[in-house]
Design a protein with these regions (language model features):
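Conserved donor-binding/catalytic core segment of Leloir-type glycosyltransferases
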Residues: 4, 220-236, 241-245, 257, ...
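Carbohydrate-associated surface elements
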Residues: 178, 199
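N-terminal subdomain of nucleotide-sugar transferases
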Residues: 1-64
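Nucleotide-activated donor-binding/catalytic signature segment of Leloir-type glycosyltransferases, i.e.
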Residues: 253, 259-260, 265-293
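Nucleotide-sugar-dependent
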Residues: 236, 287-294, 299-323, 329-340
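Acidic anion/phosphate-binding donor-loop and adjacent secondary structure
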Residues: 184, 190-192, 200-216, 237
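A short, well-ordered alpha-helix in the C-terminal region of glycosyltransferases
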Residues: 357, 364, 371-385
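A short helix/loop element that forms part of the nucleotide-sugar donor recognition site in Leloir-type
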Residues: 51-59, 206-219
Length: 403
């Protein structure tokens, strides 16, 4: 079977969409399928082309058996709504034209970004092939939630296009049960929607001893390290975490480590300086292979989203990689994500944006050795049940049935 997959994020980018697509496609190739990925020159999240690549009109490479086609797009940093929209639209257009010349039995387009789904839908029409829409975020609803854009004619147009995509797709694959419920409420038949959650590559993310060399380099030996590793975006409300850190300075030898970048990174660096806090280290992102070293030195893996009803429907992918390395989780997200962490006893949850509850749960997690070991065991069970290989196989079965 020839699978054509459209995504605007792909390795060597290291964000969750790139990782999910790559690990799924790699498994499908191992199972004998022909997979072509149309993507762009790696540039996320800083909008700078990675070393060794150029933003050319068309270039090909083979990655673990996956045929990867990289096409030109207007590249900008992950900040500023208008520029990012132009970025997304340019990829939608060039990926469509590139896709016209690829053989395919089925087309998959992943959203966000939503304009990638529009390209998939249009290709399906012109090539007379079925298409699957993968929904990893409820876009454009999430734009309004984070305050990037208020209700206006553009949003209403995008919502209209969103419904057209849902109707035209032969199958919709979502990443949470809550998304399935939300789409059903929009009038999408339940039998059209399948759930394939995120997971962990258990060959890559396995328990390891703390990296002593890294601890020495960061001058964090003998510290209790609470770490946030991932995108520093509008949805993640990391200013709240910095304010919590400021209120806990000098307490219990706690130190907060931030690793990553995103639209809010510069604001967060300025806030750190304005608050004058010394118990926070903020670093730029590293490769997927190197990120294991940073996870290894954590005592607690921090996961946070702003307080919103929409975010009760999401499951941050950070849960799974941290669980794979058996790092107990402290999470400020309600809804389905909280149900997973608490049901597996993989960590503790605090009320989103509550400083008092954040401090209370953090103290509880790091002051009770029995609880801490229980959380490590819960992480182990969680990682076992969300094995990316198994999930990739389940998604491939859906693709075969859809074809």
């Amino acid at each position: 079977m020839k699978i054509l997959f459209l995504t605007d994020n792909f390795p060597p980018e290291v964000n969750a969409p790139a990782t999910r697509t790559y690990e799924h496609c790699k498994e499908w190739v191992k199972q004998g399928e022909e997979v072509t990925v149309i993507t762009c020159t790696p540039n996320f999240p800083q909008g700078k082309v990675y070393t060794g690549y150029r933003n050319r009109l068309y270039q090909k490479e083979i990655m673990d058996g996956i045929r990867v086609i990289r096409i030109w797009r207007y590249i900008t940093a992950n900040e500023g709504f208008l520029k990012r929209t132009l970025d997304y639209i340019s990829f939608s257009v060039t990926s469509f034209f590139a896709g016209l010349f690829q053989q395919a039995d089925i087309i998959i387009a992943t959203s966000p970004q939503f304009f990638t789904a529009l390209s998939g839908r249009t290709l399906s029409f012109w090539k007379r092939k079925p298409w699957i829409m993968e929904v990893r975020d409820l876009w454009p609803e999430s734009i309004k939630t984070v305050g990037a854009m208020k209700e206006n004619p553009i949003i209403r147009f995008l919502e209209w296009e969103e419904k057209r995509c849902y109707r035209s797709a032969k199958k919709i694959i979502v990443v949470t049960d809550s998304f399935k419920k939300r789409l059903s409420e929009k009038g999408i038949p339940l039998q059209k929607i399948e759930v394939i959650k995120n997971g962990v590559n258990r060959e890559l993310f396995t328990p390891m001893s703390k990296d002593q060399v890294l601890l020495e380099q960061l001058d964090l030996k003998d510290k209790k390290i609470i770490g946030y590793i991932g995108t520093h975006g509008m949805a993640h409300k990391l200013d709240f975490i910095l304010e919590c850190a400021a209120g806990m300075e000098g307490k219990n030898n706690f130190h907060f480590l931030f690793l990553g970048t995103g639209a809010e990174k510069n604001k967060l660096l300025k806030l750190k300086d304005d608050l004058g806090i010394k118990n926070v280290t903020m670093l730029d992102p590293v490769s997927k292979q190197d990120v294991k070293r940073y996870i290894s030195i954590l005592d607690v893996a921090l996961i946070n989203l702003r307080k919103s009803n929409l975010f009760t429907t999401v499951i941050p992918s950070k849960i799974f990689e941290n669980a794979g390395m058996e790092i107990p989780i402290l999470m400020g997200v309600d809804g389905e994500a909280r149900q997973i962490v608490e049901s597996y006893k993989a960590g503790l949850c605090f009320e989103p944006e509550s400083k008092e509850d954040f401090e209370r749960q953090l103290d509880r997690l790091l002051s009770d050795p029995v609880l801490y070991e229980q959380c490590k065991a819960g992480c182990r069970k969680l990682a076992h049940d969300f094995d990316r290989k198994v999930l990739a196989g389940q998604m491939l079965n859906i693709i075969k049935e859809t074809k």
